[in-house]
A protein has these predicted regions:
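Structured catalytic-domain cores with a bias toward divalent-metal coordination
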Residues: 1-302
Length: 302
């Protein structure tokens, strides 16, 4: 594995950010190329834990000649957000300079390759240079995984409708509860920007073997060695199934098949009628019935 430290210049003299990129060389040029990043929202750590355990597994496969496809890994995809703290709280989701969500407004390349100019230009915000560079690193890879997490939640993925159910193998390998499917995007999240370029490159819309997704690895506090290893093993199993890593001869565990695949328009954000202290009656992932009480809000205790 080769490790490179790239520099993202800041907006003011003396300020710069380091982007650490790991590259593993595949033995088979025709095998799928893979790009995986985590902590684009810099305060979301489950993906970093998964990467911690995945990297040695891929290094071992590379050393033994079992890594077929080349893999690029960026465990800390947002050094700008990683450095943002306010009164001790980590502010990793939004840029305090531009007030933009770090996973929105990824640049659109034109015929002249303006996105590549952004990556080196001093005339744009460091945040835009970072976003341009991340898109460059993922460019040309048919498998692109962006590891995130929710505030609280179960394991699930976002997937383009055009790649479903072909991407069900990823949901199964990661033991996901659900897959949320989208058919159009307007916020230019990383996943959307990458998929747009996949579509532009695909002859006659042929996306066989492609996978681009945002993976939500449960909640922000779901970070420990057990979960990190489990997620790494799931990612490794997925890469084996896609022909990136040579499959093991030993029997593989049966994969989950009962996850729910639904269009994202079926997801609704519920606005509380009043502020107060919320008491949940169900846990994330539990099935509920119509009319069931899922939470109550304490407005005035006692």
């Amino acid at each position: 594995m080769k490790t490179e430290i790239e520099t993202i210049p800041g907006e003011t003299p003396g300020i710069a950010y380091e982007l650490i990129v790991h590259r593993l060389a595949g033995a088979e040029p025709r095998a799928p190329r893979v790009y995986i990043q985590s902590a684009l929202h810099a305060d979301e750590r489950p993906g970093v834990a998964a990467m911690h355990y995945l990297i040695p597994m891929l290094e071992k496969a590379e050393a033994e000649g079992r890594l077929l496809g080349s893999v690029t890994l960026v465990p800390h995809a947002n050094p700008i957000g990683a450095a943002q703290h306010l009164y001790g709280d980590h502010m990793g989701r939004f840029s305090t300079g531009t007030r933009t969500n770090f996973n929105r407004d990824f640049p659109v390349p034109d015929a002249a390759g303006i996105r590549r100019l952004d990556a080196a230009s001093s005339a744009v915000f460091a945040e835009r240079r970072l976003k341009s560079r991340l898109l460059e690193l993922a460019d040309g890879c048919p498998i692109v995984l962006d590891l995130h997490c929710d505030d609280e939640g179960v394991q699930y993925i976002y997937a383009p409708e055009q790649l479903w159910p072909e991407m069900a193998d990823l949901a199964a390998c990661l033991d996901c509860e659900a897959a949320l499917l989208w058919d159009s995007g307007s916020d230019r999240a990383f996943e959307e920007a990458v998929f747009e370029e996949m579509l532009a490159r695909a002859p006659e819309g042929d996306l066989a073997g492609h996978c681009v997704t945002t993976v939500e690895l449960r909640g922000q506090n779901d970070v420990d060695a057990t979960l990190g290893r489990k997620d790494a093993e799931g990612l490794y199993r997925f890469l084996q199934g896609r022909g990136v890593v040579a499959a093991d001869a030993k029997p593989q565990p049966e994969l989950r098949k009962d996850f729910v695949g639904k269009r994202i328009r079926h997801v609704e954000m519920v606005l509380a009628p009043v502020g107060g202290t919320i008491l949940f009656h169900v846990a994330p992932g539990e099935r509920v019935e119509a009319g069931q009480v899922v939470a109550e809000i304490i407005v005035s205790p006692g």
